[in-house]
Amino acid sequence: MKHFDAVVIGGDVLGCFVARNLRRWNISVLLLEKEEDVCKGITRANSAICYAGYDNKPGSLKAELTVRGNANMASLCEELEVPFSRCGSLLVTYDEDAVSKLKRKLKNGMQNGVPELRLLSGAEAEAMEPMLKKGVAAALYAPSTGTVNPWQLGIAAFENALQNGAEVALSTQVRAIRKTENGYAVETDKAAFAGKMVFNCAGLSADKVQEMAFAPNVRLQLDGAEYLVLDSLAQKPSRILFHQAQSCGKGITAIPCVEGNLLISGIRKPLGIPFATTVEGMQEVQAAARELLPEVDLNQIIRSFGAVRPNPYLENGESIHDFCIENPAPGFYSLIGIKTPGLTCANELGMYLAEKAANYLGAEENTSFDPKRKAISEKDNEIICQCEQITRAEIIEAIRRGATTLDGVKRRVGTGMGWCQGSRCALKIEKLLEEYSHGIL
């Protein structure tokens, strides 16, 4: 049985950042992921928003880490060479009765320390974003809101963790966890591993993973949303647009992504088939998009996807609105129901837990830790993906870094993300995968 100081279960964006930040200390780390690649769970279907922090309860851990994570996102993305856009956001309402909700969020945000937050008149909002339907009653402007590609950020953290000495076991399913004299034994379908500490970052299955060792006080209830992706448009909003309905929560969201696409997300609803889309759901999203942005060209839709969100609840059915970090025994941490704004806070949560690990293990700082990771930049003159202009050299580098499937290449360099959705380049990429796939180097 191989021994580690820390075993991290789950290789989505959160698990990758926990592993990365543990290596800031002299802590040996193993990352376990059941899929053949990282960032294939919640991270693969995400709104890509770096939130400002006005929605969170003042004084909560979520409020603290969201504002800090937002402030640090630009420097983090610079370290990891991941594109980031601080485009700002407008939370708009057309209902005079809902303006009071915006005022409460403004007060909330000011208490949380959100910078430059202000309430705009309808005319100011419409001047700022001319594509908005006329008749805006008011809007909450948050210039610190941004957007970042979620799987690119997670994969970058994963690569940085590996280059700093973390180990990984992919396609490895955790079957059981046992308390031992010196920590924990984690049994998988491949082998057993020993860890002085365990960090449960299993996303949608986090409550079930904790149940392997301890009875969880928190359970997850899943809901879903459906998304539309529009091709790069000549005319699109400059900022992220949230629609504040009179009812609770937000309605439609329009996100101008760093890649140039426009992402439109629908309203959350009870989960059907995880990550699936429906004809009815797509029709609802399109109708809501036309209502908010009458001039948006929905003929530019190139794909759709479904997302899943884990909502944490106490055993008595009470909803939990802060980040839920269970610590049922020394050295065991479960992150159960880390949802929005989990992407914004992934690095901050990783640092928060790494400091706890360093204190628990008495670990010294890793003076050789390098926070910088180089993005894929290899190019040649042979274009394989015509839609996104991705070259053969870029694809080979993605494979060298661990992509073993078409999806893995897509999430690293963007192949198959354009109009043809891979119909013209998939066979060429499969041949390169056969030729160059030898695992992570």
Task: Walk through the language-model features, giving the residues of each.
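N-terminal Rossmann-like FAD-binding beta1-loop-alpha1 element of flavoenzymes
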Residues: 4-31
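Flavin-dependent oxidoreductases
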Residues: 17, 177-182, 187-279, 287, ...
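Short beta-strand to alpha-helix junction loop
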Residues: 58-67, 92-101, 140-159, 276-280, ...
